[in-house]
């Protein structure tokens, strides 16, 4: 099976008007060579308008180019997935659509990746899961945030599920790089 999609988009994000009258093009393709296996590539090229350039004091549009490649195997309660993402284009001083000042200090490249797996320990009842992920907001190791997770999912019924996870985080942007998280979550489906 082969799937593709492409779109031409206007605007600066959800409920945001267009600031530079330019369009973004977003598309993707994926193939499914065997049942349960999907391999894909996705891309986005466009601009973000009305950005204040701190070096000139004027507003301008900045280019943004992003792509991702991914692979997934999902069959008989076994799931394995990996993805790499890359972004090129200047970011804003802080997150959100209301901040319109270019941040040259962070550079114009970022990337990240993750791999994870879920396997059944007791079919239909108990699954073990593990995940490793990295995000580098300057596409270098001195700004990386790395996270290792492991956990269990227990299904009381098809509509009631308990998740338990332990995570170790190494955030090189912080003075104290390493910290740990424990997360418990109860999901109701209706």
Question: Language-model segments: which ranges?
Answer:
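Aromatic- and glycine-enriched pocket-lining scaffold segments that form the walls
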Residues: 1-38, 42
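Transmembrane beta-barrel strands of outer-membrane/channel proteins
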Residues: 4-10, 41-45, 82-86, 130-134, ...
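Outer-membrane beta-barrel architecture
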Residues: 28-30, 68-72, 116-118, 151, ...
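Oxyanion-binding "anion nests"
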Residues: 60-98
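Outer-membrane beta-barrel "beta-signal"
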Residues: 178-190
């Amino acid at each position: 099976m082969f799937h593709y999609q492409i779109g031409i988009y206007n605007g600066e994000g959800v409920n945001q008007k267009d600031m530079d009258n330019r369009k973004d093009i977003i598309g993707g393709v994926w193939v499914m060579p065997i049942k349960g296996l999907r391999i894909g590539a996705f891309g986005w090229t466009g601009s973000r308008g009305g950005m204040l350039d701190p070096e000139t004091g004027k507003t301008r549009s900045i280019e943004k180019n992003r792509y991702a490649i991914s692979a997934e195997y999902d069959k008989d309660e076994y799931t394995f997935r990996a993805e790499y993402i890359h972004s090129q284009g200047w970011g804003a001083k802080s997150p959100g659509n209301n901040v319109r000042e270019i941040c040259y200090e962070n550079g114009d490249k970022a990337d990240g990746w993750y791999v994870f797996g879920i396997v059944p320990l007791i079919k239909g009842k108990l699954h073990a899961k593990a995940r490793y992920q990295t995000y580098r907001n300057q596409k270098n190791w001195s700004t990386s945030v790395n996270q290792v997770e492991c956990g269990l999912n227990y299904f009381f019924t098809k509509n009631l599920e308990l998740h338990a996870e332990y995570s170790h985080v190494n955030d090189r942007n912080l003075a104290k790089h390493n910290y740990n998280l424990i997360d418990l979550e109860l999901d109701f489906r209706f």
